[in-house]
């Protein structure tokens, strides 16, 4: 049974590399049907389901997207339970919580933020070269700074989340630049960094990142989508 689970995980990884997310998650879930606490199958299923939900517009309600994100969180929590010392499980949980939080009202988003940050930090403590966890921390800082001053005041004073005092644009840039440094071939890092630079009116730096997005080869399932987002951002920046 363990070998059957391992075979399905290997097939899921191959499907991921082929950018076939639906087939990948089928194999990861087949592995979990054999061994529900298989650490790698759980965290990989969580990340794959999250990616499958990403194309749905954030501005519209989507039960399908919400279901994908809920399944992702469930698998990520199980991965952490199966192997608390594994960086990828903590990263998958931070990513799953982060995706779900983006769909929620501000107050609910803030309630999730502390755990998202702590899970990403835990992943980095275990693996200091985890580019995905640095990406989440960069995004975390940026999303907190994008909130209104009133929302941040509410978080600090009524939710008891003093951790929000540590959020800054400088941290957002530092962590996202670190993600780019660790994996310069990952398109998503460059797109997110361009977005942060644009927020800080560093338009030349943003443009440089967007040109990299355009020039880099498609490597992952969502890369074509990210290239489209980058082209859209480039058009908006050209009007400034």
What are these regions (language model features)?
Residues 1-40, 48, 203-217, 231-240:
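Extreme N-terminal leader/anchor segments
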Residues 29, 77, 121, 194-195, ...:
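Amphipathic alpha-helical segments within well-ordered protein domains
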Residues 150-160, 183-187, 207-240:
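Terminal, low-structured helical/coil segments at or just beyond the last alpha-helical repeat
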């Amino acid at each position: 049974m363990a070998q059957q689970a391992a075979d399905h995980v290997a097939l899921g990884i191959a499907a991921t590399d082929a950018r076939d997310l639906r087939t990948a998650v089928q194999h990861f879930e087949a592995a979990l049907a054999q061994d529900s606490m298989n650490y790698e199958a759980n965290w990989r299923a969580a990340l794959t389901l999250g990616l499958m939900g990403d194309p749905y517009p954030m501005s519209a309600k989507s039960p399908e997207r919400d279901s994908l994100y809920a399944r992702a969180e469930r698998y990520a929590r199980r991965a952490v339970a199966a192997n608390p010392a594994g960086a990828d499980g903590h990263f998958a949980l931070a990513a799953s919580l982060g995706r779900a939080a983006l769909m929620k009202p501000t107050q609910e988003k803030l309630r999730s933020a502390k755990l998202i940050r702590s899970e990403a930090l835990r992943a980095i403590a275990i693996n200091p070269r985890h580019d995905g966890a640095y990406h989440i921390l960069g995004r975390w800082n940026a999303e907190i700074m994008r909130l209104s001053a009133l929302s941040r005041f509410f978080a600090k004073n009524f939710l008891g989340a003093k951790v929000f005092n540590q959020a800054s644009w400088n941290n957002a840039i530092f962590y996202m630049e670190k993600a780019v440094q660790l994996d310069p071939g990952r398109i998503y890092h460059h797109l997110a960094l361009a977005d942060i630079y644009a927020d800080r009116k560093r338009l030349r730096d943003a443009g440089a990142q967007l040109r990299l997005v355009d020039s880099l080869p498609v490597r992952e399932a969502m890369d074509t989508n990210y290239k489209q987002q980058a082209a859209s951002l480039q058009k908006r920046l050209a009007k400034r």
